[in-house]
Amino acid sequence: MAKFIVYTTWYHEKGLRPADEMQDGMRKNVKPLSPAEDVFWWKMDDNHHQSITIYSSEDAAKKHRAELEEYRKKSSNEYSIKMVEETMGPVIAQMSKL
């Protein structure tokens, strides 16, 4: 099965937290609970960050979906953030695998 990617954009009402706080949040809240192969967060501007989550398959992403939605709801309230965009789909080419 092909790897599966979930891409999101998030709005931070109070501005982005410092990188070390974002990394700590990922370390404590995302890494232990996520079956994803990898997750990248990056700064878009002072009030937005974007994210790519890489799953081993679409099935793995679907199985994680309910838990992910619950985590998103909690973190949205806790950190005053809102998801403004989400797209997803199967990987069709990966340079490191060529």
Residue ranges and their predicted role:
Residues 1-50, 54-70, 77-98:
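Short S/T/G/P-rich N-terminal loop/turn motif that feeds into the first structured element of a domain
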